[in-house]
Amino acid sequence: MRAVRASLVFVALLLAVSACAGDGRPVDLANVTSVERPTPVGAEENPPASSGTSAPAPDCDPKASFRPDGALPPAGQMPPRTTMRAIQDRGQLIAGVDQNTFLFGFRNPTTNALEGFDIDIVRQIAKAIFGDPNKVQFKVVTSAGRIKALQEGDVDVVVRTMTATCERWKDINFSAIYYTAGQRLLVDRGSEVTSLDQLGGQKVCAAKGSTSIKTIAANPAKLIPVQVDNWSDCLIMLQQGQVAAVSTDDTILAGMVAQDPNLTMAGPRFTEEPYGIGIPKANVDMVKFVNGVLVKTINDGTWAKSYDKWLGQTGGSRPAPPTPVYRD
Ligand code: GLU
């Protein structure tokens, strides 16, 4: 009896094998269109409004920073008892940056080095302190992690497409503005959508902790905000058809368009996003120093060179660098 069963199993196996071998075509193909596409880790739909401190942001001019104190000290000779001297003595500037935003802060896949407009700014600060633009320890921070990294003293500066807002000024200081971006919309090429108002009931992606996600959530058309940890997660969700659009700064969206010609920016800018360098609240001396570095970077043509290198490839003409505004 056992022998009969064994030979039946053998015959069944033979039939199964011949089903594949037959005329050379595989059988029983899995229905690949039904495979579920993975959602980026941490993606959240309709997130609760950010907890934050409940007090409203005080009225302020978020673009106004602290005036530099005269000429910059020579590199390698930071004045005693200053934040800059402590950084010089440590031997490295510690900078919070992004590694997922092509053109501003991204990892070059062939060299593994961090590159982009924001990374160039970090190197200018290091050059002013040490005379060497490479004396930097980069720490990758998410949009949502920027303020905490500064408050906990994990980094000396955050240079990460960060909009200076009155709400953020409550917790940290900002340098003068080094770039002015604006929020726009990214959609599939061929889409008719040109504004957030047309996306009622649809999913729109932005990073957690960004000004962009708040603007999406506040739109009266009642969109479904989808928040993720990294901008590259939004790009993937749009490419996989999991969201109808991405909406954030035109700078970040330009980097996505450069990576995927099937996408396009639609409609005009609908916010102003002035970028400042984040600095811990206590380090006003560092803010003044960094503002001196920004003036030098703009005046000696370094800003324009960096703009041409990273944003020149996105078309359009180079804007004038922002004019610094100070509090006094
Ligand atoms: N500039 C916006 C912000 O600071 C969006 C960019 C980002 O989060 O990286 O929130």
Task: Give residue spans per PLM region.
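A ligand-binding cleft/hinge motif common to bilobed small-molecule-binding domains
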Residues: 161-170, 239-272
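Extended ligand-binding regions for polar small-molecule ligands
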Residues: 43-78, 210, 277-315
